[in-house]
Amino acid sequence: MSIFRNKPEAFNSDHLALFLSKEILRLGLYQKFNKNEKIFAFMPFMHSEIFEDQIISLNLYSNLGIKENFHSALKHFNIIRKFGRFPHRNKILNRKSTDEELAFLKTPGSSF
């Protein structure tokens, strides 16, 4: 659990984590990682609100062959595909939610 959970600061370093994950891929460092290390190293792609990063996430987690992680990546991807962002972050980041996002947030499993 993050010490900044439910606070805007929780997302302050996301860009750095994503940069490091991209470097890990670019340099091929992940090839020496075990599955748990790969799961962790690839998470910034899953947590990114950039659609292209979501596609990378799906490919990475699909190649890992762990159903639970792939299903989580797919869930994140589908939310970004539909809304272009994670609606559960709106309140924390002081973003205005659309009516569609508000309806979505009332459904079970809409938040992480």
Where is each model-derived feature located?
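Active-site-proximal binding-pocket segments
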Residues: 1-56
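Acidic, Mg2+-coordinating active-site segments of isoprenoid diphosphate-utilizing enzymes
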Residues: 5, 88-92
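A charge-rich, low-complexity, intrinsically flexible signal that marks solvent-exposed coils, linkers
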Residues: 88, 97-110
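C-terminal binding/interaction regions
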Residues: 65, 72-81, 87, 97-99
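Charged, gly/pro-rich active-site loop segments
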Residues: 52-68, 73-76
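Residues that form generic nucleotide/phosphate-binding pockets
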Residues: 23, 44, 60, 79-82, ...
